Amino acid sequence: MTAATDANWAPLEARLNGDVEVIHEFMWMFGDKDTGVEYYKHSITRRYLLLHRDGRCFQQSLNGLVEVDFGTDLRRVREHPEEGR
């Protein structure tokens, strides 16, 4: 992996249609230049949202990155642990 150090908010901003309130819940951690995936960490749940530069959403698996539904993964990332019980 070749890590990018310049924050790229464009994929998150595009997927959230510029919803600043939700965007501010996230921290950009790094980008992977090899895969084109940006890693955003939710500031409360500490879960990661992985977005490709083209907007596709991924989760890390034992076999590498797997494409997943953005809406479903956004809910997973934002869901507080006590809400998921």
Predicted regions and their residues:
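Mixed-charge, Lys/Arg-enriched low-complexity segments
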Residues: 2-20, 60-85
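Acidic, low-complexity, intrinsically disordered interaction modules
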Residues: 20-71
